[in-house]
C-alpha cells in the first residue's frame, strides 16, 4: 500500500541517500555508552569547569536529539538529558558530515570530554559523532508537545519521548509493583503463577472474554480473577501465596476501568477478614512510606493517608443515609423500599442485591478518605464465609478511596457443602439474567472437600493503586498500551 509522506519525511529519507554517498550509515551497529546522564550529573555536577578540564574525562554518551541550537545539541537518554558541544572545526570529516545531516529525533553516539558551559551546566565536548538511528518521522515540536490525551495513548512511544511526566509515571509503576513484592516477600508469602485460560468462569462477578481452545475442542475463558486456583494452593499446604498478573473482564471502559488490568490477590491460611484488612492496609502503608507520600489528589479529592483506615458497616452506612434500619426489613419490604428509591429490579434480585444497589446509590459517593466497608450480603458474596451473627451477611469488606473501590477481601468460605449451594444459587441467577454470575467449579469444590484451613484473602487493583500514588486521572495514563477505538 502506497503511503503519503509529509515534506519532512521526504527530506529525512533523502538524507539517508546523502549519508550513504558519504559512506555513512543511517542505521548503525550499536556502540556501548560508558555513562548515562544520571551518573554524570550525580558524580560531576559540583566540580568546576577548571577541575573537569584538568581531569580530561572522556565518555561515550548515547541519546536522542531533543534540541539543536547552533553547535549545541541536547541528547536525551533513559535517565535525563545531556548537552553536547560540537565544534565543526575540531570534528573529523565523518563526524562533521553526520552533524550537518542530523535532525531532531535522531539517535547519536557521542565520544568526548566532560566540561561545563558558561552557565555552569555539564557539557560533553564532542570529538566523534556517530549516527546510530535516523528518525524518519519528525517529533512534535517541543513547545506544543504531544498534548492530546488520545494521541498520547495511541502513540505511547512518542509520549514517552516527549513527556517527562509520562516517563516518571511508568518508572514509578515499576517501583510500586516492586514495593508490593517487597512487602509480601518480607512476610514469607510466595509468588505463584496460575492459568490465564480457564475452562470454568469463576472467582468474581464479571463478564468474560471467551476464546476457543483448538487442541481441547472447547471454549475457554480468559481469567476474571485468580481466586479459585490460589485457594486450591492453600488447600495444598502453601499457607501464604500471592499472584500479580493480568485479569480480563469484557466490560466497559472509563477513567478507572480497563478490560485488561493488573491485580494482586493474596491468601493467608489461619487469617480472616480482620487480618486481611491489616494486610491490605499494610500494603498502602509500606508504599506510602517507601515513596514518602503525604497526600495525593485523586478523582478530584485531596486524600490524606491516616492509619488505621476508617471502618464502617455497610448496613449501618445505608441505614444512616436513607433513615431506615434495613436490618429489620424482610425481603418483601426491601423490594418496596427499592421501588420507593427508584431502583430498577432485575429478575434475579433478592434481598442482598437491593442492599448493594442502595449502597452504590447513596453511600459510595461519600467515601472520600480511605475506608473499609464491611458486612456485605450473601447474595453478592458467593465465595465469602457467612457472618455467624447474621447469616444474611458475610465476612467481607471493600476498601474505598476517593469514592472508588481499591480492594476486596474476606474470610474465605471453606465449607464445601455451603460453597456448592452458593454455586448452584449462582446458576439460578444466571438463568434469570445475571450475566456476571459464576459457574460451578467442581474441581474447586473437590479441593475444598479435602479441607481448606480457615483463610483470609484479598485483591487489590494495581492500576488504580498506581493512579492514586502517581496522581493520574485516568487508568489509561498508567497502562502503557491501553486498548482504544480504531481510528476512522
UniProtKB/Swiss-Prot annotation:
Which Gene3D superfamilies did the record assign? Bira Bifunctional Protein, Domain 2, Nucleic acid-binding proteins
Protein EC: 6.1.1.6
Show the Pfam families listed in the entry: tRNA-synt_2, tRNA_anti-codon
Q: What does the record give under GO molecular function?
A: ATP binding; lysine-tRNA ligase activity; magnesium ion binding; tRNA binding
Q: Which residues bind Mg(2+) 2?
A: 405
Provide GO CC annotations from the record: cytosol
Q: Where in the cell is it found?
A: Cytoplasm
Q: What is its cofactor? A: Mg(2+)
| Superkingdom classification of source | Bacteria
As its record notes, the protein acts as a catalyst of: tRNA(Lys) + L-lysine + ATP = L-lysyl-tRNA(Lys) + AMP + diphosphate
Q: How does it assemble?
A: Homodimer.
Q: Could you tell me which NCBIfam families the record lists for this protein?
A: lysS_bact, PRK00484.1
The name of this protein is: Lysine--tRNA ligase
Organism classification, top ranks? Bacteria, Bacillati, Mycoplasmatota, Mycoplasmoidales, Metamycoplasmataceae
Q: Which gene encodes it?
A: lysS
